[in-house]
Design a protein with these regions (language model features):
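Extracellular/periplasmic metallocenter environments
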Residues: 2-8, 12-25, 33-35, 40-55, ...
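Long, charged N-terminal interaction/targeting segments
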Residues: 27-32, 60-63
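Short acidic/polar alpha-helix capping motifs at helix-coil junctions
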Residues: 32-38, 72, 84-85, 99-102
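N-terminal edge beta-strand
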Residues: 51-83
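Hydrophobic residues in beta-strands and at strand termini
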Residues: 63-65, 78, 88, 103, ...
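Solvent-exposed coil/turn segments that connect beta secondary-structure elements
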Residues: 66-68, 83, 89-93, 106, ...
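Beta-strand-rich interaction surfaces with strong enrichment in secreted/lumenal proteins
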Residues: 73-76, 108-112, 122
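Histidine- and aromatic-enriched segments that form or immediately flank copper-ligand environments
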Residues: 87-118, 141-148
């Protein structure tokens, strides 16, 4: 019969590294960020504050990122030619957990959003389709789960704005 001598992650294996209350390391960290210090006018401070708003041909997506998901993560009702502003707030508070953001078909580069920060980007979809968005900066063992989709409908479509948020 074999005895387990040690249950410990190997180098580069982060599965066990995320079960620690921030209060245990706060005094040892070089930098932490309080969400209350984020003064960006487009910031949201919780997943429940996320939303998608249409004003004519302009759509504002107020989104959050945290290991290992975006909220909202599935968005419908965007139309070809809309000016879509994605306002992404990184809800992480420890300095070393940035999140990236890119959409297939972006005409500009990705965003890199540091903990506690909000960054915005403009996207104008040029064709109908389903466009994946994803995190471009490795953040945790479930990094590949950080993705979602935007469905773009034809101009004048009756598809209403809809999106997923936590219950």
């Amino acid at each position: 019969k074999m005895n387990m001598l040690l249950d410990f992650p190997t180098v580069g294996e982060p599965h066990y590294a995320q079960a620690l209350p921030a209060s245990m390391i706060r005094d040892k960290q070089i930098r932490t960020y309080s969400l209350s210090e984020n003064k960006d006018p487009y910031a949201v401070r919780s997943e429940k504050e996320t939303r998608v708003e249409r004003k004519g041909n302009v759509v504002h997506i107020y989104m959050t990122s945290i290991r290992s998901h975006f909220v909202p993560d599935n968005i419908e009702g965007i139309q070809v030619g809309d000016s879509v502003y994605v306002h992404l707030t990184n809800l992480e508070q420890d300095w070393d957990v940035p999140h990236g953001f890119a959409v297939l078909g972006f005409t500009n580069s990705e965003l890199l959003v540091m903990p506690g920060q909000t960054r915005s980007v403009l996207w104008i979809p040029r064709r109908v389709g389903v466009f994946p968005f994803y995190c471009t900066d490795f953040c945790s063992a479930l990094h590949q789960e950080m993705q979602g989709y935007v469905r773009v409908s034809p101009r004048g479509s009756a598809v209403p704005i809809s999106f997923n948020t936590p219950k």
